[in-house]
Structures are given as structure tokens and as C-alpha cells.
């Protein structure tokens, strides 16, 4: 498959988030000429998330094991494209998101994964941009410190299918108390993760709610502890230097 014929599969794990999912899928439908398939992974929804996905022409698969890691992994396994994009149900991709994902991989043939940032689409309007920048700025700085390289942001990233296949047996997909994007970042790191300011999505500010933030912090800590001390950041950096040399 030549670079100019890369196919993009978009994976969206969901549980009981039909309203947000409809907005996400509507945004993807407007750029469908750049998307080979959309895969929605239903992780035990009791609302009409699956029906919403089918109305927008998405492929729906069911993952019975609870947790985003299990659902996302099932979606990646099912993807048929050479590039696998990942959005959350509350992600609202920009009108050129899919085209920019494909363009990035065309231009960077040795990069295995690329991630971008986000802006909040709800909450106080005056705080949407600054709040998202503070939240994501802290995420990228702190998690990069734990990893020794750029982390993936689960609401907005894409990777080569070949990169996923190389680590799919290693990730902790059955652990419901981790951040799947952080876990995947630990395993994909040696293969090359890059940040692109050109990949834009909107997201909900729900992670900043009291309960949501506490849960994210717990998951983040567990995601790191699972990989330390064997993958302390300076050891990972040194391993990459030796590999490059």
C-alpha cells in the first residue's frame, strides 16, 4: 500500500453517551471522503449509543470486558485501515481532522503515532480555551515527564495499524483502572510518538468535574505504577539513545 493510498479507520469506544456520540459522528460524516471506516465499540451501553452509531453508518462491535482499554483495543483489532484514528465519544473533530491525520502520516513515514490537543466545547465560554490549555498543558508536561517522551491524548490521536499490532499483546487492555492512552504511550514510545498542533478536536469539560478529576488522577497513577521501575523515564530515554546509535 503506497503512502498516498493510506486508509483511515476511526475507533470510538462508548458507554452510555449517545448524545455526544451523535455530535462526534456528525462531524466525521462531514469529512467521510477521507475516512475508510468508523468503528464504534459499545462497552455495555444501556442507552441507544449503538443505534446512533448505526444511523451514521458506523460499524458497531460489542466488547463485554469493562473499561476503555478493552473497548479501544477491540476496535483497534477490528480496524482494516493502515492508519487507526482514535476519538472519544465526546470528541468533536475539526472539519479537516481526517485529512490532516492522513497528511501527517504521508509526510512522516517513520512516525508511528501522532497526537493533538483540544478545546472545551462546553462550560463557561470565557474559560473554554484557557481551561483546556491548562488542563492539557499539565497532562502533556507531567505525563511526558513520567514517560520520557510525548504521550498520546486519548481524545485525539492516530497511529499506524502496524504499530498497534506490534504492541497489542503487551498493553493492559483488561485493566479497567488505567488510562488506556497512557498505557499505550508506554508501549508505543520506542516506535515514535509525535505531537501536531494541526490536529484539532473539541472535548467536554467533564474531566474537570470533582469526581471525574479524582478518577482520572487515580487511573493516571496506576498507569504509571504498572510500568515503573522497569520503565522509569531516564531508562527509556537511554534505551532509545542506544537503539538510535
For the regions a protein language model found, what residue spans apply to each?
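N-proximal low-complexity "stem/linker" segments adjacent to membrane-targeting elements
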Residues: 1-27
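Short, acidic, metal-binding catalytic loop of nucleotide-sugar glycosyltransferases
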Residues: 26-35
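A conserved acidic beta->alpha catalytic loop
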Residues: 42-50, 91
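Glycine-rich, basic loop-to-helix element that forms the pyrophosphate-binding segment
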Residues: 63-79
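Short beta-strand-to-loop acidic/aromatic patch adjacent to the donor-nucleotide binding site
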Residues: 81-92
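Conserved donor NDP-sugar-binding/catalytic core segment of glycosyltransferases
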Residues: 96-127
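Short, flexible, basic/aromatic active-site loop/helix in glycosyltransferases
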Residues: 116-121, 129-150
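Acidic donor-binding loop at a coil-to-helix junction in glycosyltransferase catalytic cores
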Residues: 175-184
